[in-house]
């Protein structure tokens, strides 16, 4: 367990793997924590210096008031890399984490060696959905949306066969401060990188669960089409968080991708 006070923000992070290995930054999704990348972090730590962290307002990282933007959250990622003395890193992100990763590839391409964009899109809308979700959370609390969110994160078969994992992620959601979730959701609501995808110049792998209804395979196809040279892998029998639901398949796709760089 490690914490850093970076530009006034307490950030919880973890570094695994040899210090001399290529850095790999893992960015988690809205409402989760760096633990959603735990299987990949462990598997890849032999060949990478794996850096995981909790986004502001998530996990054990400090929350801040007000709406967040992708630029703000991408800045947090760069500040952490600066704190750790990392000039350039491979970057992988899921959902909101994937939007942050896209932002880094577009606005700080010199800092990014490659991108893995999991179950994400250049824009996740419509905006009214996020406003309605925020209103529901403020009215009835985080617990009122847990079942609906879990049904998007995981397939019914996984929830039935691995209830302990699904319930653990549900507990994580329930405990998250409502305003911290809403602040981060504003970054998703307002983000749209569709017109700038062509500026991503690094090798890119797009991953998507075949049963993802939040950012479906069609959105992944659009990312692949918009990013020069991008590759696409569809993870079978997975919804929005394949890193948890199908960890071996995600790790295998990432290992194959990195081997080809």
Where are these regions (language model features)?
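Flexible "cap/lid" loop of the alpha/beta hydrolase fold
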Residues: 99-146, 153
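Short beta-strand/loop motif that positions the catalytic acidic residue
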Residues: 200, 206-208
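Conserved acidic catalytic loop of the alpha/beta-hydrolase fold
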Residues: 71-89
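Residue in the alpha/beta-hydrolase core beta-strand immediately N-terminal to the catalytic nucleophile
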Residues: 54, 90, 113-116
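Catalytic active-site module of serine/aspartate enzymes centered on a nucleophile-bearing elbow/loop
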Residues: 230-261
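Conserved alpha/beta-hydrolase catalytic His-Asp/Glu region
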Residues: 11, 125-128, 140-199
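Acidic catalytic loop of the alpha/beta-hydrolase fold
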Residues: 210-215
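Conserved HGGG/HGGXW glycine-rich cap/lid loop of the alpha/beta-hydrolase fold
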Residues: 9-63
